[in-house]
């Protein structure tokens, strides 16, 4: 039971479901080239929490998992050009502590304890371009690259072959990883929003080199933009070591907004 719970928590944390309907105020804008307002907090239950450092600068991290599996990102807005909003996102991810925790026998074990997990981290860089095809909708395209730094060998038998988690850890076993995708979100009724996106991962140096994730979300936002409830699905396809697999996962989250 603990193993199943640990897997679900990990998948929810990696999944990150967002939607947006407050387009003019730039709330709930993770996954787009827009930054949240200065001094505003958005605290997610399963997703990364975000803070607006300045007009064109925001910081995101997972507070509940920070000491177990830290992942910190900074998004920099570069302004608007010919109707397109441009931004770059830069992050660092440290999975060593988490992988060592699950390297155990019995309940909660995802990796055999016979293997040594070295100190390692990954650095990611992503370019985002957003465009508003309609007044209450945003279309975003993004592309990025992630590469890993390891301070020792990592046995390929230590992979965690689970959807969402595997493609994000694959960079530690192979060459750099490229990602590209599109994100389409907006508002169809006051307080109700939607999101639909597709993300592709291409991993160099291995035959298990392609993963696809498609997410669809409906969301309700409170009148004062202090609470957002999201629910939907995530469809995953990947070329795992055991062969191609499909997975359909639920997506749920509560996000609390503080400040304007």
Please place each PLM-identified region on the residue numbering:
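Sec-dependent N-terminal signal peptides
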Residues: 4-15
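Outer-membrane beta-barrel transmembrane domain signature
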Residues: 25, 115-260
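Outer-membrane beta-barrel biogenesis signature
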Residues: 18-42, 247, 253-255, 259-260
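Gram-negative (and chloroplast) outer-membrane scaffold detector with strong preference
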Residues: 63-151
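Short hydrophobic/aromatic-rich motifs at helix boundaries and adjacent loops
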Residues: 20-21, 42-48, 185-188
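Transmembrane beta-strand segments that form the barrel wall of outer-membrane beta-barrel proteins
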Residues: 31, 35-67, 72-74, 78, ...
């Amino acid at each position: 039971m603990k193993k199943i719970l640990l897997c679900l928590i990990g998948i929810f944390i990696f999944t990150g479901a967002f939607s947006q309907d407050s387009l003019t105020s730039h709330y709930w804008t993770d996954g787009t080239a827009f930054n949240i307002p200065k001094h505003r907090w958005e605290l997610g239950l399963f997703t990364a929490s975000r803070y607006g450092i300045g007009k064109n600068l925001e910081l995101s991290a997972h507070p509940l998992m920070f000491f177990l599996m830290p992942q910190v990102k900074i998004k920099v807005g570069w302004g608007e050009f010919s109707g397109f909003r441009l931004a770059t996102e830069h992050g660092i991810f440290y999975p060593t502590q988490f992988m060592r925790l699950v390297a155990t026998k019995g309940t909660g074990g995802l990796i055999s304890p016979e293997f040594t997990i070295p100190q390692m981290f990954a650095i990611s860089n992503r370019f985002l371009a957003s465009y508003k095809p309609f007044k209450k909708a945003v279309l975003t395209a993004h592309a990025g690259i992630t590469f890993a730094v390891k301070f020792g060998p990592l046995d390929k038998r230590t992979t965690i072959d689970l959807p969402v988690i595997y493609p994000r850890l694959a960079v530690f076993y192979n060459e750099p990883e490229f990602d590209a995708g599109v994100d389409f979100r907006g508002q169809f009724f006051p307080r109700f929003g939607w999101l639909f996106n597709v993300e592709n991962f291409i991993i160099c140096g291995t035959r298990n080199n392609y993963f696809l994730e498609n997410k669809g979300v409906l969301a309700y936002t409170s009148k004062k933009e202090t609470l957002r409830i999201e629910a939907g699905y995530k469809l995953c396809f990947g070329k795992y070591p055991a062969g191609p697999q499909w997975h359909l996962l639920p997506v749920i989250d509560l996000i609390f907004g503080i400040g304007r």
